[in-house]
UniProtKB/Swiss-Prot annotation:
Domain CoA carboxyltransferase C-terminal: start-end pairs: 42-296
PANTHER family on file: ACETYL-COENZYME A CARBOXYLASE CARBOXYL TRANSFERASE SUBUNIT ALPHA, ACETYL-COENZYME A CARBOXYLASE CARBOXYL TRANSFERASE SUBUNIT ALPHA, CHLOROPLASTIC
Protein name, entry field: Acetyl-coenzyme A carboxylase carboxyl transferase subunit alpha
Encoding gene, per UniProt annotation: accA
InterPro entries: Acetyl_CoA_COase_a_su, ClpP/crotonase-like_dom_sf, COA_CT_C
Role, per record: Component of the acetyl coenzyme A carboxylase (ACC) complex. First, biotin carboxylase catalyzes the carboxylation of biotin on its carrier protein (BCCP) and then the CO(2) group is transferred by the carboxyltransferase to acetyl-CoA to form malonyl-CoA.
Documented EC number(s): 2.1.3.15
């Protein structure tokens, strides 16, 4: 079961009332189907009201849900014959990033993604989804292998950010991230990145220099967490909600800004409500995107990728002069 957020309380309470009424009807052998149907209709309306008008901070909470599907959850549903590969051939194997080769619709692909845990024990093993340099170097090794064998690359982004510890810095965290940005820009195969949860800072961008970038409806993508931004701007991490509203970190915001290519719909309440329904949405997008990119010559692919990232952050001159 996914964790319950404050804004979901009215929905959760009504669901519980319906469950209680069903149990009461069965226990007393009473026909309360009419009353239950009315309550279910109200529940549907209430879910629409709550989930169709989510605020940025509420989306942050959904993106952080500990039951939200991870990279490996999607790999299990979307791909066949997945063979996980380990190690960066320089230091070790970072379990905060998983990757390997797989089959998608009968064709070979390389799949890479951040991997967080779903409980404390697993999160410790996977560094809470925050990679060390060896994780990014493992990812790059797999990308270069994919380029060699002409396999498309599919990346799943889901991290609060790169691991901030002393050992990670000593082993070249910033260099590893920068190297990935450089190398991904020049990969001669189609690349697709999908933000499935949190997309935090350079730790996310190291898997995000792709031909197409897509986001799940309730995912976030930002240079810093709302708490971090609040601590810097107002010296108070408790103002994270205010920061989230100002940062434009949600999928609708980023689509409007031209940073992402599409928004992938989620089930009501988030991807954690129905893994297979969410995977179906991703599947439809992937099939179309891979077909679209496969038709492009390598030089066109590289030119369009370059132009895509050069446009990010660009403000048209007329907008700048009018203050818009």
């Amino acid at each position: 079961m996914s964790s319950e957020q404050e804004f979901e309380k009215p929905v959760i309470e009504l669901r519980q009332k319906i469950a209680d009424l069903r149990a009461f009807a069965m226990e007393r052998d009473m026909d309360l189907s009419t009353e239950i149907k009315k309550m279910e209709a109200r529940l549907s309306e209430l879910e629409e009201e709550v989930y169709a008008n989510l605020q940025p901070w509420e989306r942050v909470q959904i993106a952080r849900d500990h039951e939200r599907p991870t990279t490996l959850d999607y790999v299990d549903v979307l791909f066949e014959d997945f063979l996980e590969m380990h190690g960066d051939r320089l230091f070790g194997d970072d379990k905060a990033i998983v990757g390997g080769i797989a089959t998608y619709k009968g064709k070979p692909v390389t799949v890479i993604g951040h991997q967080r845990g779903k409980d404390t024990k697993e999160n410790i093993v996977r560094y809470f989804g925050s990679p060390h340099p060896e994780g990014y170097r493992k990812a790059l090794r797999l990308m270069k292998q994919a380029e060699k064998f002409k396999r498309p690359i599919i990346c799943f982004i889901d991290t609060k950010g790169a691991y901030p510890g002393k050992a990670a810095e000593e082993r070249g965290q910033s260099e590893a991230i920068a190297r990935n940005l450089l190398e991904m820009a020049g990969l001669k195969v189609p690349t697709i990145s999908i933000v499935i949860g949190e997309g935090g800072s350079g730790g996310a961008l190291a898997l995000g220099v792709a031909d197409e970038i897509h986001m799940l409806e309730n995912a976030t993508y930002s240079v810093i967490s709302p708490e971090g931004a609040a601590a810097i701007l107002w010296k108070d991490a408790g103002k994270a909600k205010k920061a989230a509203e100002s940062m434009r970190i949600t999928a609708p915001d980023l689509y409007e800004l031209g940073i992402i290519d599409s928004i992938i719909p989620e089930p009501r309440g988030g991807a954690q409500r129905n893994l297979h329904q969410q995977a179906d949405e991703i599947d439809r997008l992937l099939e179309k995107a891979l077909t679209r990119l496969a038709e492009k010559p390598v030089d066109v692919l590289l030119d369009e990728r370059y132009e895509k990232f050069m446009k990010i952050g660009h403000i048209p001159e007329e907008a700048a002069t009018t203050g818009q």
